[in-house]
Amino acid sequence: MEMIFALVFAVIIGLVIGYVSISARMKSSKEAAELTLLNAEQEATNLRGQAEREADIILKDAKRETNSLKKEALLEAKEEARKYREEVEAEFKSERQELKQTESRLTERAASLDRKDDNLTNKEKLLEQKEQSLSDKTKYIDEREEQLAELEKQKEAELERVASLSQNEARDLILAQTEEKLTKEIAMRIREAEQEVKERSDKMAKDILVQAMQRIAGDYVAEQTNSTVHLPDDTMKGRIIGREGRNIRTFESLTGIDVIIDDTPDVVTLSGFDPVRREIARMTMEALLKDGRIHPARIEELVEKNRLEIDNRIREYGEAAAYEIGAPNLHPDLMKIMGRLQFRTSYGQNVLRHSIEVAKLAGVIAGELGENATLARRAGFLHDIGKAIDREVEGSHVEIGTELARKYKENPIVVNTIASHHGDVEAESVIAVIVAAADALSAARPGARSESLESYIKRLHDLEEIANEFDGVKTSFALQAGREIRIMVHPEKIKDDKVTILAHDVREKIENNLEYPGNIKVTVIRELRAVDYAK
């Protein structure tokens, strides 16, 4: 039993040992198999990675080669295109050159043909002139032949008549012929003497005028219609214009002067044909720039102030001019009226300076001729006084000036000089003739007057006069070189519904009465202002 048990135990032990041994071998085999598998997988991975890298290298090489081929092909294409373009441009250039040469040849041929045509025309004219000259000469020769034939007939008849005359009849005939010849000679001598006297008198008159001009030596030239005001800097232009243009509109409406603001640095131009308005505008603009306060109320205040200042200056101008020509006892009212001529031009010539110049010339000429030089200067000074108020009073400046001289009891010679200096009435004194000559001399001096400027000013003045003729018009200003007429009306006389009608009527009258280039803008302004003061 124990043996069986021991045997069984031994068998069990053997089985256990065998199992353990087999298990160990099996585990070892499994681990070996797993290691082999891992190695195989690792090798496969390495091979795949190597294959992928080689494939990438091959792909990159292929792409690089492809890009290289593309670039080479593109460069070749560009080179071919460039060569083709150069060939085409060269061909076009050659064709253009040929066209230019052809055009030049055609131009030269045309010029040559024109010259030939001109030459032919000139030759034709010359031939016509020669033919006309030949015809005239032939006609003259024919006439002379006829005259000679007639003279021969007369001589034959005269000889026949003389042959039949007695001694007394022949003597009477000779005396008559001699008397006729002497009469012709005397008439010729008289004409020569008259011509000599005329030449000597002309020379004396010229000598007197030359002496007068040398002693006066006037340097005044034609005035312009613009004034310039210098600005401290360009920023002032914006302040002058004001918000939405209120300042510049107010300034132009109150002064009647165009304000021109352009690209000229630090300058504003004031343009207008009326020198008084332009001077008021200049003084106002300079005062605004100096004061720095630029707004509609301040503009209105300064315009009114400068109008009063101009009135005072007008009197000063008249007094200074009267003293300059030696007439200090002139009536004060006449001095003030003469002062207004400082702001009046005639054909661009300042009328006050013209009057002073005429006075001095008349004084010099009168002195040379032994006349009253003081009275001549006075008459010359006052000869154009009517121009100071001819825009306010009906009549010519000659008529107005004559009435003023009579009103202020001037010397009758002065009155007649004013009335006759344009030939409206007959001159009654030597002084009147002297002043007329001095007036013509001053006006005809080179640079003294400008016909085109006077025509321009007259057109603007006529434009304003047409507007002022309508009832209810307060004042009017011709602006923009006559391209616009701006009309201010009395608000109590012209209502809003009448403004358009007034503009239409003014436009119609301008079209019927004036000749002008382009268009004229008619602007009617009705302003109703209410002012009160809080106390």
UniProtKB/Swiss-Prot annotation:
Pfam family for this entry, one: KH_1
Any GO BP annotation: mRNA catabolic process
Chain residue ranges for the region called Disordered: 99-126
Transmembrane segments: 3-23
Segments forming domain HD: 351-444
Name under which the protein is recorded: Ribonuclease Y
CDD domains in alphabetical order: HDc, KH-I_RNaseY
Key words, A-Z: Cell membrane, Endonuclease, Hydrolase, Membrane, Nuclease, RNA-binding, Transmembrane, Transmembrane helix
Domain KH: 225-285
UniProt key word Transmembrane: yes
Source superkingdom: Bacteria
Entry similarity comment: Belongs to the RNase Y family.
Source organism per UniProt: Streptococcus gordonii (strain Challis / ATCC 35105 / BCRC 15272 / CH1 / DL1 / V288)
EC number: 3.1.-.-
Bilayer topology term: Single-pass membrane protein
GO cellular component, one term: plasma membrane
Enzyme's top EC category: hydrolase
Name of the gene this protein is made from: rny
Listed GO MF terms: RNA binding; RNA endonuclease activity
Keyword Cytoplasm applies: no
Function: Endoribonuclease that initiates mRNA decay.
Primary location: membrane
Compartment(s) where it occurs, according to its Swiss-Prot or TrEMBL record: Cell membrane
